[in-house]
């Protein structure tokens, strides 16, 4: 089972189908429009576990969470929802002993009405699971996570995900608060990208005070805000006006030029960030150029998606970008994700692993 943004089930299904085929696991995705999830039905027993282990979760773009389904309950009795789940799981020999329990719903308005029930249900369910030996007596982040996902009252999928190959967040969504002094809500996209793409223990080194960043298409400054907040200096490139609150920090230089034409005058930039409303292929190529020329070491940027053929567009743009970097002998690590705060767009992170001689 995979969670995704409502309206992106088709893209999520295309992706799981591709990844399963690569692992020689065969089946088909069950897709219900705007449901916020996809269930991939495997033809062979044990294949769901193979996918939960074998698919690199961080390589999935459209999935917010992934777990192997062990059982589906379509009509749990309202007076006792615990016993049928315990009875079923106790019969499954291969079900792993779990270290954490998450009782969740897909991210739709209808399903989220069940969240209050999910919260109330968690403590008695956890106690019952521990009593049956299905969970360890103490929370253990190194053990599998037990997921119960309610898609409707009395209708749930029960399964497990593996630590290090799942989303650490409840429902696959980081809980971020909008900072009152940020100039636009887009600031949360970049903050979420830092949480998703950069391990927390590396923040001090890779998002360090005193670094220089460049923000293309910066105004009014939602993304710049995240860099300034981390005591960085920023070249803001946009013909529009920047928020006064950012200008007053003394940490930014505003360049009123086209983002596609700006060139940094010194090679001291660590971060290039970009959230321009432009054709995705054009933005991807621009970011490739920045990294190739040694103008930045890391990039986070958004690719706006077309109305149709979104998955194909993403695959094509990423393939072209990877090919461009490989042909130019740039060593890199690339991640892409349809973040919670993204809408008709995805966010890409590229870290340069090789020092490139200036061209």
Swiss-Prot record:
Keywords: Cytoplasm, Methyltransferase, rRNA processing, S-adenosyl-L-methionine, Transferase. This is Ribosomal RNA large subunit methyltransferase M. HAMAP family: 23SrRNA_methyltr_M (MF_01551). It comes from Vibrio campbellii (strain ATCC BAA-1116). Gene3D superfamilies: 3.30.2300.20, 3.30.70.2810, Vaccinia Virus protein VP39. It catalyses: cytidine(2498) in 23S rRNA + S-adenosyl-L-methionine = 2'-O-methylcytidine(2498) in 23S rRNA + S-adenosyl-L-homocysteine + H(+). It is found in: Cytoplasm. Catalyzes the 2'-O-methylation at nucleotide C2498 in 23S rRNA. Pfam families: FtsJ, RlmM_FDX, RLMM_N. Monomer. Its EC number is 2.1.1.186. S-adenosyl-L-methionine binds at residues 186, 219-222, 238, 258, 275.
